[in-house]
């Protein structure tokens, strides 16, 4: 039975690298896969051509999704032309709740495994919409570990401005010149001064 997987971490843990390598492994064995990534800054319901790229310079072509793209319909149409063996979704935190359920139907009704990769929380320590839904309904959760500057496991992400100061307010997604750093909870609180809850 196909499953819906969610692999999550803080920033810069290697999620995109692992996704690209996993997709390559399928293709190397002659299996067809479909890759998706957020076209977060695109508009409309059109599926855009996009690219998944990693910090270590690996890249792969992908379809881009915006919040209005019906992923179940898109995957079903593609699978009717070419049998698909797996679906890979990068930047899964940007999925809408509906899109997470659409991907669950890809696994449940079409029998195609769906592997989603994304951040768990934003720079304020809050769950992204897509991540929250995936944490709730995915068949299997996987955490990729990265480390804080102190050597402890990094579970949080801080957004720094151009001067290196932590930002504590603003849009959840911001494409301006920002720098993100992965931190353990203690150092995230020290840097941001935020104490959620």
Which residues does each PLM region occupy?
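Structural motif
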Residues: 6, 86-88, 115
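Walker B catalytic acidic pair
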Residues: 90-92, 118-119
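Conserved ATPase-coupling elements of RecA-like P-loop NTPase cores
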Residues: 92-103, 123-128
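Short basic (Lys/Arg) and small-residue
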Residues: 138
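Short recognition patches in nucleic-acid-associated and regulatory proteins
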Residues: 146-173
């Amino acid at each position: 039975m196909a499953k819906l997987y969610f692999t999550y971490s803080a920033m810069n843990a290697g999620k995109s690298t692992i996704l690209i390598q996993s997709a390559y492994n399928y293709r190397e064995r002659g299996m067809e896969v479909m890759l998706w990534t957020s076209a977060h800054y695109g508009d409309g319901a059109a599926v855009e051509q996009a690219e998944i790229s990693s910090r270590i310079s690996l890249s792969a072509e992908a379809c881009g999704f915006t919040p209005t793209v019906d992923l179940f319909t898109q995957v079903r149409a593609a699978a009717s032309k070419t049998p698909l063996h797996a679906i890979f979704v990068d930047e899964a935190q940007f999925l809408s709740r509906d899109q997470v359920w659409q991907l669950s139907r890809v696994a449940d009704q079409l029998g195609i495994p769906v592997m989603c990769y994304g951040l768990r929380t934003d720079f304020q320590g809050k769950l992204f919409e897509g991540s929250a839904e995936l944490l709730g309904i995915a068949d299997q959760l996987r955490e990729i570990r990265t480390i804080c500057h102190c050597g402890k496991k990094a579970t949080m992400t801080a957004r720094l401005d151009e001067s290196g100061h932590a930002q504590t307010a603003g849009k959840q997604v911001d494409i301006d010149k920002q720098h993100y750093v992965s931190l353990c909870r203690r150092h995230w609180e020290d840097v941001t001064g935020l104490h959620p809850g």
